[in-house]
UniProtKB/Swiss-Prot annotation:
This is 1-deoxy-D-xylulose-5-phosphate synthase. NCBIfam families: dxs, PRK05444.2-2. It is an enzyme of class 2 (transferase). Catalyzes the acyloin condensation reaction between C atoms 2 and 3 of pyruvate and glyceraldehyde 3-phosphate to yield 1-deoxy-D-xylulose-5-phosphate (DXP). It catalyses: D-glyceraldehyde 3-phosphate + pyruvate + H(+) = 1-deoxy-D-xylulose 5-phosphate + CO2. GO terms for biological process: 1-deoxy-D-xylulose 5-phosphate biosynthetic process; glyceraldehyde-3-phosphate metabolic process; terpenoid biosynthetic process; thiamine biosynthetic process. SMART domains: Transket_pyr. Mg(2+) binds at D177, N206. It comes from Nitrobacter hamburgensis (strain DSM 10229 / NCIMB 13809 / X14).
Amino acid sequence: MGVCCATAPASDRRSRHPDMQNWNVAVTDFSKTPLLDTIRTPADLRKLRVEQLRQVADELRKETIDAVSVTGGHFGAGLGVVELTTAIHYIFDTPRDRLIWDVGHQAYPHKILTGRRDRIRTLRTGGGLSGFTKRTESDYDPFGAAHSSTSISASLGMAVARDLSGGKNNVIAVIGDGAMSAGMAYEAMNNAGAMNSRLIVILNDNDMSIAPPVGAMSAYLSRLYSGKTYRSLREAAKQLGKHLPKMIADRAERVEEYSRGFMVNSGTLFEELGFYYVGPIDGHNLDHLLPVLKNVRDMENGPILLHVVTQKGKGYGPAEAAADKYHAVVKFDVSTGAQSKSKPNAPAYQNVFGQSLVKEAEKDDKIIAITAAMPSGTGVDIFNKAFPKRTFDVGIAEQHAVTFAAGLATEGFKPFCAIYSTFLQRGYDQIVHDVAIQSLPVRFAIDRAGLVGADGATHAGSFDNAYLGCLPNFVIMAASDEAELVHMVATQVAINDRPSAVRYPRGEGRGVEMPEVGVPLPIGKGRIVRQGSKVALLSLGTRLAECEKAADELAAHGLSTTIADARFMKPLDVDLVLKLARDHDVLITIEEGSIGGFGSHVMQTLAEHGALDSGQVRVRAMVLPDEFLDHDTPNAMYASVGLDDRGIVAKVFEALGKDVTTETVKLA
């Protein structure tokens, strides 16, 4: 069947499968993947013989490597679950059986097998496939993901919904050992164990942080313990124990627990949480995976945890040798593994932060760096090389990171909590309750502020201006360029009576001249970058560069424009805001954040001081739209929502009651 279909012309294959008419055959080399070519959905996979699955997995890995070499994206984790993905879709009846991938980094092979192979080379591009699972993209994605450790909670909800509805389908969560460092995963497991819900959790252990060595004995025991005979005998023993004196029954139960614990000691914690533990087994050995998954599928009672050991980057030499470098990649040469990284024109913001913190720490031994499993992404790895004893990676545990920092602050230390904006959301109660209410001087370095591009809505740093700006006694800054970031880090070091935050985007700076050392800024004071008379552009953050380009175009239209860098959202430079409103016909605020942020604070200030009463100044706030934006390049995303130079010019003309198109034609 596979050979026949693979050797037929592409047009013949499309005619046999009308639903494949839109496949982009031109960008996919099907000739190297004859069995995979026959699979449009998992239903096609399940028609194959068991002995064909090894070839399917090999071809699936080959296709994943080739696709990601074209698009870039998360890489190592997906290669590590190729066999597991193949086996799950072969054994379970997806999408009727719900399959939830935690985070979604490993979901590319899953997408290829579930009707999206034709678009796999559009991953993370505008209008293309998401880099994560997404409900609106496919019925095979029953739950969206991107942030860590949500899969077990979501799966338990689906399992309970199934039970309440009288359904019989399976619910499977696949979660990595790294995600198991988050408290939410254990909260969900504790709840699932107490409810005794029929739920399957597959622990994908790809860092060997949990598992002992695996092999034939482990595979045998996993088949034994997951088999119906053993489980029936175990259940019968439990029923018998109910009729025995309590002391004897308790001793018998302990003997059974000890015997299983002796043979499979890594399952003790999960058994205590109420899960029936199976494993560990080799996640790359289909002969081990398939029978155990079948046994697990057919279990009728209670939550089950299947422990599978895999290797990140499996099957691709460069990724196996350097898992950290191939966790996420840009486009690369498949034959060499060399990634197509262009030479930067300016330093990346996270590196500027890390280097600035090192310079400050050389003068102050109280400075501490904290990250939540993102040392290289935040620049904390730079600090760690210089001060390993003052660096703490707490794992995927943002709530703990914030309160841990608060504890350090109570003892006179100066903790810098470096966390992406989108992940800091997970520690919000701790920011309010443990930091802000107590006025503890925890310093937040908020990376990936604003739109981040290819990772889309789940990773956008859109809301921190709003969710931090409403907190009393909080200093909030935004760097307009990399030099400003250096000074803002120094400013945070000097703030010892309240919490502070500095936000900055992903990617490179502007290439401005860098200061040798950071100098603390006057708290709550902005700066005038360019003086004009007709229009005022008040920017918070890196949209300042777009304001400068917009001002040049406005000047060509005869509109003299002032550009101001707010620097501080809180405390706001009230004098500067009132002066800009008083001296100009139009005042525009620009920020890389949502409604409720900087622009709202400016409007509130103007209203409180009566600056809007006379109607002499026309004020507009330019913010991100009130919607979640799909992935694209950051520049394309900002342009699409009008937060670029053209959008700023258009907003000025709109405030003046003029048509920008007409005015541009006049100028030409």
